[in-house]
């Protein structure tokens, strides 16, 4: 029972950190990275598809992405999808290749991205703490039902706290790395 609660808490906390990492990949730094366009969806035969399922996205150089749709007829739709995404990018089609130059980040944009990253990190910390609260509540209910002793409950709560501290530290490290990437010119 206690181990199940700990395993569940660990898995849920890990998912929170993975979600944060995915969100951080959507925040662009000054460098080109294929995952930058992961959030872009394209209308493909009547349904919205992620860009990486209708085209290949490659890094051409440090500030340019090359997007090659698998069907030539998709070039205008892919170009429009990138342009209308809220990433502030202006793609240019050349034949069946769409080049996406990344404008250099202004100081103000960097600050806004850092603020956004800090907000995402705080949301992840809150999610981890909510998992801790749920796990502690489950332990208290087991204690109330006399399925575990007070010592077992106290020990399990300490272990859940250690898990929480571990994942919050991991979140802080991810945030520090992202801030460092954003501040590099």
UniProtKB/Swiss-Prot annotation:
Chief location of this protein within or outside the cell? cytoplasm
Q: Does the keyword Cytoplasm apply?
A: yes
Q: Which InterPro entries match?
A: Ribosome_recyc_fac, Ribosome_recyc_fac_dom, RRF_sf
Family the UniProt entry places it in: Belongs to the RRF family.
UniProt-recorded Gene Ontology molecular function terms? ribosomal large subunit binding
> In the UniProt record, which is one GO cellular component term?
cytosol
UniProt-recorded name of the protein: Ribosome-recycling factor
NCBIfam families, sorted: frr
Its localization reads: Cytoplasm
Q: Report the record's Gene Ontology biological process terms.
A: cytoplasmic translational termination
Q: Name the domain of life this protein comes from.
A: Bacteria
Q: What's the stated role of this polypeptide?
A: Responsible for the release of ribosomes from messenger RNA at the termination of protein biosynthesis. May increase the efficiency of translation by recycling ribosomes from one round of translation to another.
Keyword Chloroplast (UniProt): no
Keyword terms of this UniProt record: Cytoplasm, Protein biosynthesis
């Amino acid at each position: 029972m206690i181990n199940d609660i700990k395993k569940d808490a660990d898995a849920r906390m890990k998912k929170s950190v993975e979600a944060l990492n995915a969100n951080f990949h959507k925040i662009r730094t000054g460098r080109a990275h294929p995952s930058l366009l992961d959030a872009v969806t394209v209308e493909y035969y009547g349904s919205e598809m992620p860009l990486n399922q209708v085209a290949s996205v490659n890094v051409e150089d440090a500030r340019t992405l090359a997007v090659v749709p698998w069907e030539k007829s998709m070039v205008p739709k892919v170009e429009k999808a990138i342009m209308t995404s809220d990433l502030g990018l202006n793609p240019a089609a050349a034949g069946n290749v769409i080049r996406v130059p990344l404008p250099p980040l202004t100081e103000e944009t960097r600050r806004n991205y850092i603020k956004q990253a800090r907000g995402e990190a705080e949301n992840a910390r809150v999610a981890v703490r909510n998992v801790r609260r749920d796990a502690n509540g489950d332990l208290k209910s087991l204690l109330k039902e006399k399925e575990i002793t007070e010592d077992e409950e106290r020990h399990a709560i300490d272990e859940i706290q250690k898990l929480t501290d571990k994942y919050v530290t991991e979140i802080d490290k991810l945030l520090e790395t992202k801030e460092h990437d954003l501040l590099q010119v």
